[in-house]
Amino acid sequence: MNYATIKWADVANGPGVRVSLFVSGCTHHCPGCFNEEAWDFGYGDLFTPEVEDKILEALAPSYLKGLSLLGGEPFEPANQAVLLPFLRRVKERYPDKEIWCYSGYTLDGELWQDSRARCEHTDEMLSLIDVLVDGRFVEELKDLNLRFRGSANQRIIDVPSSLKAHQVVEWKGEHTIQPIQK
């Protein structure tokens, strides 16, 4: 697997400061995609054990809230095969850090049902992810006011609760704003 880039102190792709890994390879080809160059599976650099180790080291500070996976498409089967052992390492070393994943595939669609995205790694990979932002980017539904997603059709999903309930459960985390009382 190749990766397009790594953001070592990202505040846009999940709550708090995070490390964000942008994988290469995506077959969705959404019009208006912000990362079109990452559609190519060969784009960027090889995701090596040394890169994994560097990310694991970068996650050590307590102010880092977690890891975000973006793309490209993390749930392309070829990417799942590489990401799954890496996510195991992340969860083993940092069980309290949140893993967020952005996917054009939907949880209750392609990831839970028979599809080209669902493979022998999908269920375990989902079990290691805390929050999934699912759904393809739809340019006509783009809204810059949305937090942690690009278009209104995309959902922010609490994966552990969804797996337990066998249905999609919306993430109720840190996205409420309290007015200041005078």
Role assignments for model-derived ranges:
Residues 1-3, 17, 35-115, 120, ...:
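Conserved Radical SAM active-site core
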Residues 1-22, 27, 31, 35-42, ...:
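N-terminal [4Fe-4S]-dependent radical SAM core
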Residues 124-127, 150:
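Short, conserved loop/helix-junction motifs that constitute active-site signature segments
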Residues 76, 140-141:
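Short glycine-rich, flexible loops that bind phosphorylated cofactors or substrates
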Residues 86-91, 142-182:
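P-loop/Walker A phosphate-binding loop and immediately adjacent motor/lid segment at beta-alpha junctions
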